[in-house]
């Protein structure tokens, strides 16, 4: 296979190509040649080998270049192949340097929030660090929601922002915002680079911080004069994170793992409660379940970490979880909480949650242990290592023979039969649950699903079959509307050739609808699946249940003509040159979804659904399992 250097050398011999075409050809050839991504070293120094010299980079290894070029080279050394960047005055030096990169492709979203959500989904769906770049001032502040989202959902991201020149910092200069201060509480760490020689070290540290321990977002703010300053990069500068590295969790001790297995052996009704912290541990988790026979329920972030079609799957628990998952946790005598944080949407009334159970909590973040629910046994460690250790102990002993949870399985199977997920059918009205079931059937549960936030998000969690980690992409902790479309685009960039569907609501979709331009220009095969009820459906559901159906600004259509579908998403999509179809009858759904999936490139399907439908089951906020609501909808007076 050709190396990056030989690919570059072959291109340097082309004397008739224009600089623009040569740059494009060089970029494509080099990307194809790079079969294995370069990884930023965790505890060792970055590779001393300079990127291949090309006509785009006329300097030698020991010759000065701009700080912006040093930044881009540092990104390359950390394995970056895709960035999501929108240019502006304080970041244009970085964009100029990106045009000189033979490796990195920029994906031009139409809003900084969109690009940052895309970077988040890129990371969620691939496990690689997502990178977004914005200019100073409003460009930087437009990243804020996505950074807060990434912190709550433990997503490895590096956000790079341009800043006004150093001499202007603090003068209220044009487009100056103290973004380090703004983001201090919504990032894992952040930097203001004041010395061009710090760029190689800072970038290496940023990627290490973002991806190690509990992952999270890191922001790097770089003044424009630093970007323009000439310097010779010192690639062998080591990281300087002694305190952080010393506090990283160690591999779990065998005696603690043996204690957990003893509790499993003593239990009769154990339940595994699995969250987003198990995203990298799917194989180990499945093996642990195979060895023990413990039923599994997942959080919203944990969907796909254990196959939801497995006989031992209880699917999702919590506010809109299944009856049988919440029943299992309520009746359990042992709760194994792996990679979770006992979020309020899961636990409801915290005192009543798993009230009969001994609790084992394994998490990589010591701050989460005992924060909301005090465990009986806690292990601060990487869940993957803990599962590997317990599997090794189980495989090397006869402990497995002592696990007999047959009667517990029978009890839960009875709950599944008595309380399956379900919905009512009203003639030709399209029930949103039905539309998702058809999508699941036609994709065989293999698509990557991104969502916005609202009722459609919960129905997508309930009615699609998730079979593997990183298949489900949603703003869980922050609940940020507008996540779905840019997230689907970011996932499509990270996973070429994989079907990606944005299951969205009309409210969420409209918040970042401008990214239709991006998916059309890059011809990404993103399928936009809008469940359009002309309302903020989840808020309407709460109005119905708790506010006597008093509508307080939740109708999103045209109040002068409520029968009109407004806005016209089909017309808007066609304005972006994206094929689109609207369906209003149940009998049209199967053929319409099939056509959407078979169409090359992007496609929008506008599915008109009733606004009276409610997401059920539902445990009211602050309630317990005994308070679960199982029936009713907006057609009922409460």
Swiss-Prot record:
Cofactor note text: Binds 1 Mg(2+) ion per subunit. Binds 1 thiamine pyrophosphate per subunit.
E.C. designation(s): 2.2.1.6
Region annotation (Disordered) ranges: 44-67
Needed cofactors: Mg(2+); thiamine diphosphate
Region (Thiamine pyrophosphate binding): 455-535
Cellular-component GO terms for this entry: acetolactate synthase complex; chloroplast
Catalytic reactions of this protein: 2 pyruvate + H(+) = (2S)-2-acetolactate + CO2
One of the GO biological process terms: response to herbicide
Amino acids binding Mg(2+): 506, 533
Pathway assigned in UniProt: Amino-acid biosynthesis; L-isoleucine biosynthesis; L-isoleucine from 2-oxobutanoate: step 1/4; Amino-acid biosynthesis; L-valine biosynthesis; L-valine from pyruvate: step 1/4
Record has Coiled coil as a keyword: no
Disulfide-linked positions: 132-278
Residue range covered by the transit peptide: 1-39
GO molecular function: acetolactate synthase activity; flavin adenine dinucleotide binding; magnesium ion binding; thiamine pyrophosphate binding
Keyword Ribosomal protein recorded: no
Binding of thiamine diphosphate, residues: 112
Compartments (UniProt record): Plastid, Chloroplast
Keywords, alphabetical: Amino-acid biosynthesis, Branched-chain amino acid biosynthesis, Chloroplast, Disulfide bond, FAD, Flavoprotein, Herbicide resistance, Magnesium, Metal-binding, Plastid, Thiamine pyrophosphate, Transferase, Transit peptide
Sites where the protein binds FAD: 214, 320-341, 363-382
Family statement drawn from the similarity comment of this UniProt entry: Belongs to the TPP enzyme family.
Miscellaneous notes: Acetolactate synthase is the target enzyme for sulfonylurea and imidazolinone herbicides.
Protein name: Acetolactate synthase 2, chloroplastic
Organism, as annotated: Zea mays
């Amino acid at each position: 296979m050709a190396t990056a250097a030989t690919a570059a050398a072959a291109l340097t011999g082309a004397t008739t190509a224009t600089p623009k075409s040569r740059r494009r050809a060089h970029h494509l050839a080099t990307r194809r040649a790079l079969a294995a991504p370069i990884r930023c070293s965790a505890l060792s120094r970055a590779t001393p080998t300079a990127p291949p010299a090309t006509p785009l980079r006329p300097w030698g290894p020991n010759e000065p270049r701009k700080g912006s070029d040093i930044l881009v080279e540092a990104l390359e050394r950390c394995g970056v192949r895709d960035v999501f960047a929108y240019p502006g005055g304080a970041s244009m030096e970085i964009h100029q340097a990106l045009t000189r990169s033979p490796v990195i492709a920029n994906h031009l979203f139409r809003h900084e929030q969109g690009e940052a959500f895309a970077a988040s989904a890129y990371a969620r769906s691939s496990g690689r660090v997502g990178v977004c770049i914005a200019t100073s001032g409003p460009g930087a502040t437009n990243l804020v929601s996505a950074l807060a989202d990434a912190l709550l959902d433990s997503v490895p991201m590096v956000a790079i922002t341009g800043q006004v020149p150093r001499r202007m910092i603090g003068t209220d200069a044009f487009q100056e915002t103290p973004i380090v201060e703004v983001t201090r509480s919504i990032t894992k760490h952040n930097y203001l680079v004041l010395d061009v020689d710090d760029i190689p070290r800072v970038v290496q540290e940023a990627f290490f911080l973002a991806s190690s321990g509990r992952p999270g977002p890191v922001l790097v703010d770089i003044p424009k004069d630093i970007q323009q300053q000439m310097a010779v990069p010192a690639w062998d500068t080591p990281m300087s994170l002694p305190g952080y590295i010393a506090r990283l969790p160690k591999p779990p001790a065998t005696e603690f793992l043996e204690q957990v297995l003893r509790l499993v052996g003593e239990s009769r009704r154990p339940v595994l409660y699995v969250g987003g912290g198990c995203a990298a541990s799917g194989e180990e988790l499945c093996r642990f379940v195979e060895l023990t026979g413990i039923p599994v329920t997942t959080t919203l972030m944990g969907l796909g970490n254990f196959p939801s079609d497995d006989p031992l799957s209880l699917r999702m628990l919590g506010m809109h979880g299944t009856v049988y998952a919440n029943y299992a946790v309520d009746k359990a005598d042992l709760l194994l909480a792996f990679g979770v944080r006992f979020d309020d949407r899961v636990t409801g009334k915290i005192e009543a949650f798993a009230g009969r159970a001994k609790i084992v909590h394994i998490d990589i973040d010591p701050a989460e242990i005992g924060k909301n629910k005090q465990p009986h046994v806690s292990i601060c460690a990487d869940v993957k290592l803990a599962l590997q250790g317990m599997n090794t102990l189980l495989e090397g002993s006869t402990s497995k023979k002592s696990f007999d949870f047959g009667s517990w399985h029978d009890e839960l199977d009875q709950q599944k039969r008595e309380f399956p997920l379900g919905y009512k059918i009203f003639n030709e009205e399209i029930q949103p649950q039905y539309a998702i079931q058809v999508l699941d059937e036609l994709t065989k549960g293999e698509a990557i699903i991104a969502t916005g936030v609202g009722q459609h998000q919960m129905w997508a969690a309930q009615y699609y079959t998730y079979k593997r980690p990183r298949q489900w992409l949603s703003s869980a902790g922050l609940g940020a509307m507008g996540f779905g479309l840019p997230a689907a685009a970011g996932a499509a960039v990270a996973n070429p050739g994989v079907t990606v569907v944005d299951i969205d609501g009309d409210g969420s979709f409209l918040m970042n609808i401008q990214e239709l331009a991006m998916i059309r220009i890059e011809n990404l095969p993103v399928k936009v699946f809008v469940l359009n009820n002309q309302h903020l459906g989840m808020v309407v559901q709460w109005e119905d249940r708790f506010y006597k159906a008093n509508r307080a600004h939740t109708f999103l259509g045209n109040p002068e003509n409520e029968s009109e579908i407004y806005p016209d998403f089909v017309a808007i999509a066609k304005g972006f040159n994206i094929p689109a179809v609207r369906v209003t009858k149940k009998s049209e759904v199967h053929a319409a979804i099939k056509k959407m999936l078979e169409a090359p490139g992007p496609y929008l399907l506008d599915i008109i659904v009733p606004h009276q439908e409610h997401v059920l089951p539902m445990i009211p906020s602050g309630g317990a399992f005994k308070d679960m609501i199982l029936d009713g909808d907006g057609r009922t007076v409460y």
